[in-house]
A protein has these predicted regions:
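Extended, low-hydrophobicity, polar/charged segments
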Residues: 6, 10-196
Length: 196
C-alpha cells in the first residue's frame, strides 16, 4: 500500500482559467463528494493513478452551480468547464446508456457520434429523474467520476488533456480533475469529435 503523495501546497498546482475559486485536495474533503464519486476517486488513487491525488474540490453555493452562472460569478474561463450529459437509446429492447463528457464550449454530437457508438437508431437525452436515480448523484452535479459500470463512458478528446471543472455528484461543490484522471476512469473511451 503506497504512500499518498499530495502537493506540498495548493500553490504547487496551477489551473489555468480557475478565476477566484480556491479548491482543496478532494481526497481530504470527501464530504464534498457524492458517495459514488468518493468510491471511484478513492479506487483510482488506490490503483496508483497518481493524478487522482491531485483532484481538487471546492464548495460553492448550489444557486451558482450552473456552468454559465459559475463562470461569470468566479471569473472562470468557460473552456475549463466540462459537462457530463447522459444519453440513452434502445437496441432490440435493451436500453443503452452513455455518459458523455464534452467541454462546456461545445455540445455532444448525439445524433451522429453517440448514436453510432451506442449502435442505436435513435438516441436522446435521459430524463432528469432517471438520471438522478440511476447515478446516485444530484441533478446539476452529475459527473463522469463514479457512473455505473454498465454505462458507456465517452470522453471527448478535448477533455483528455488539461484540467476540467466537472460535477462532484452534489450541487454544492465542483471537482477539478486532469485529462489523465478522466482517461483512467473504468471503461473510459476517448472519442474524437464527440463535442461539436
Amino acid at each position: 500500500h503506497g504512500e499518498q503523495t499530495y502537493p506540498e501546497t495548493m500553490s504547487d498546482i496551477i489551473i489555468p482559467g480557475i478565476g477566484s475559486l480556491e479548491p482543496a485536495p478532494a481526497l481530504d474533503h470527501l464530504d464534498l463528494l457524492a458517495p459514488p464519486v468518493t468510491v471511484a476517486l478513492t479506487a483510482l488513487a488506490e490503483r496508483g493513478v497518481a493524478t487522482a491525488s491531485s483532484a481538487l474540490v471546492v464548495a460553492i453555493d448550489p444557486e451558482l452551480a450552473d456552468t454559465e452562472v459559475m463562470t461569470r460569478e468566479f471569473d472562470m474561463d468557460l473552456t475549463l468547464s466540462s459537462n457530463c450529459i447522459l444519453v440513452a437509446g434502445k437496441r432490440a429492447g435493451e436500453e443503452r446508456i452513455a455518459a458523455c463528457v464534452v467541454r462546456a464550449t461545445t455540445n455532444a454530437d448525439v445524433n451522429h457520434v453517440v448514436k453510432k457508438r451506442l449502435d442505436v437508431r435513435k438516441a436522446s437525452f435521459w430524463p432528469q429523474e432517471r438520471a438522478v436515480e440511476a447515478s446516485g448523484m444530484e441533478y446539476g452535479g452529475i459527473t463522469p467520476v463514479g457512473v455505473p459500470g454498465s454505462w458507456r463512458l465517452l470522453i471527448d478528446s478535448a477533455c483528455s488533456v488539461g484540467w476540467s471543472c466537472i460535477g462532484s455528484g452534489l450541487r454544492r461543490s465542483k471537482l477539478f480533475v486532469t485529462g489523465e484522471v478522466l482517461a483512467a476512469l473504468p471503461g473510459a473511451e476517448i472519442v474524437e469529435g464527440l463535442g461539436v
